[in-house]
């Protein structure tokens, strides 16, 4: 999506792993323009606390668009405290139907430590089947690595870090400078 309006912008891998009563969300810090790394320390994973209920969100795509969506999500969560799935469905409906929001180019992974969801501009609110999900340019690499590591006894954070390291080794738009947030219910 972002490549249509901004053909040279690339970057971001966000991965979420749910295991042992917690969810870990990890994101790399690289932002690239064409073949140039513009920034290596961007924070694409955020902790939100609307109405005192903690949520962790990671985003891929346009940063400004993602922040707009995160602000909207916070408002939806304030209107439906502790109901992450409901708030995400309401946001997805707005995102799909509102003329302004429809043009936003970002994807989100959100979790409250129990529920884990991916939100897309197509109106999708998806819950992963295997307690692992990923978005962004290196998302498929991180997802494959994490799915393989889920067969081990490693804790969620270690799975996330190892999978992100593998993605960073393969995807030129992903680096090893991670932001990692943990949340449990």
Curated annotation (Swiss-Prot):
> What SUPFAM superfamilies does this protein's entry cite?
N-terminal nucleophile aminohydrolases (Ntn hydrolases) (SSF56235)
A GO cellular component annotation in the UniProt record: proteasome core complex
Q: Does the keyword Cell inner membrane apply?
A: no
Q: GO:BP terms for this protein?
A: proteolysis involved in protein catabolic process
| Protein family (similarity comment) | Belongs to the peptidase T1B family. HslV subfamily.
Subunit:
A double ring-shaped homohexamer of HslV is capped on each side by a ring-shaped HslU homohexamer. The assembly of the HslU/HslV complex is dependent on binding of ATP.
- The name under which this protein is listed is ATP-dependent protease subunit HslV
